UniProtKB/Swiss-Prot annotation:
Sample GO molecular function, one term: glyceraldehyde-3-phosphate dehydrogenase (NAD+) (phosphorylating) activity
Membership in a protein family: Belongs to the glyceraldehyde-3-phosphate dehydrogenase family.
Protein location: Cytoplasm
Protein name stated in the entry: Glyceraldehyde-3-phosphate dehydrogenase
Residues annotated as binding NAD(+): 12-13, 34, 79, 315
Site positions (Activates thiol group during catalysis): 178
Organism: Cutaneotrichosporon curvatum
EC number: 1.2.1.12
Superkingdom, natural source: Eukaryota
Length: 337
């Protein structure tokens, strides 16, 4: 039986999580809350998407609900998470995708409305973080609020895990060349905490900070303190790429590195870590449901212990698919607890 889910925040990730949920089979979205989008506008925003294209099915309103392919979804417009009637709507698990309620204390407010568990679709300062294919075994049913980490951590961690398990990572630096996101400005505007981040997104390559590499140490404890990184925001709408430079404990040829990544992509990390030897560019990964796709032809070894590895990710679609996978996993664990 499909897990009943509510979505708080119908922005980029909220909408793409819903698209993924409709494809997933194990996830049944029964309610959406967004105080800034009325029902008619919700239909429009879900139906038309500049990046992923028009939704192929029928989207309409009926009796105050959002109806997709004949399936009714309750819609609320509460600003206070504690006031959202998740329980009444039948939502056991809530995807917190506003980007605002990212701590345990704030995300826990959803529990007051009847939700049983909250999955934050962003990194969290204090909630346990999980990355599919990396540390799901650490999940405990008593957790009420968990985080799906960031899209970049979801790309980096599976790759780092394979390399670390096979050759050992002494240390590493990561750069993510990252597509534009909703927090950026179309033209120069005020951004008091991040001056560079306030510059026009369409006109610039913008250096930015990211905690994605350090967060790998939270999901792979043996890598704690061994990785850090930065981001370049670039003028594309979606798809990003991780550039990971690592020093290895155990020497390996680039062919050996490719071999273990390919094996993992066909085995224990199938569907999460992909592998390609094609001459690909970013748009080739639009709509990719994998967390990370290793680009075998783009990497460069300097010697047998120092190597640059490249991996692509659809920072919207692939990440949203993992949100659905994480919910399906924890729901199964919760039922068997």
């Amino acid at each position: 039986m499909a897990t009943k889910v509510g979505i708080n925040g119908f922005g980029r990730i909220g909408r793409i999580v819903l698209r993924n949920a409709l494809e997933h089979g194990d996830i049944d979205v029964v309610a959406i809350n967004d105080p800034f989008i009325d029902l008619d506008y919700m239909v429009y925003m879900f139906k038309y998407d500049s990046t992923h294209g028009r939704f192929k099915g029928k989207v309409e309103t009926k009796d105050g609900k959002l109806v997709i392919e004949g399936k009714p979804i309750s819609v609320f417009g509460e600003r206070d998470p504690a006031a959202i009637p998740w329980g009444k709507a039948g939502a056991d698990y809530v995807v917190e995708s506003t980007g605002v309620f990212t701590t345990i204390e704030k995300a826990s407010l959803h529990l007051k409305g009847g939700a049983k568990k909250v999955i934050i679709s962003a990194p969290s300062a204090d909630a346990p973080m999980f990355v599919c294919g990396v540390n799901l075994e650490a999940y405990k049913p008593e957790y009420e609020v968990i985080s799906n980490a960031s899209c970049t951590t979801n790309c980096l961690a599976p790759l780092a895990k394979v390399i670390h398990d096979n050759f050992g990572i002494v240390e590493g630096l990561m750069t993510t060349v990252h597509a534009t996101t909703a927090t950026q400005k179309t033209v120069d505007g005020p951004s008091h905490k991040d001056w560079r981040g306030g510059r026009g997104a369409a006109a610039n390559i913008i250096p930015s900070s990211t905690g994605a590499a350090k967060a790998v140490g939270k999901v792979i404890p043996s890598l704690n303190g061994k990785l850090t990184g930065m981001s370049f925001r670039i003028p594309t709408s979606d798809v990003s790429v991780v550039d990971l430079v690592v020093r290895l404990e155990k020497g390996a040829s680039y062919d050996q590195i490719k071999e273990v990544i390919k094996k993992a992509s066909e085995g224990e990390l199938k569907g999460i870590l992909g592998y390609t030897e094609d001459e690909v560019v970013s748009t080739d990964f639009l709509g990719s449901t994998e967390s990370s796709v290793f680009d075998a032809k783009a990497g460069i070894p300097l010697n047998d212990k120092f190597v640059k590895l490249i991996s692509w990710y659809d920072n919207e679609y692939g990440y949203s698919r993992r949100v659905c996978d994480l919910i399906a996993y924890v729901a199964k664990k919760d039922k068997s607890a």
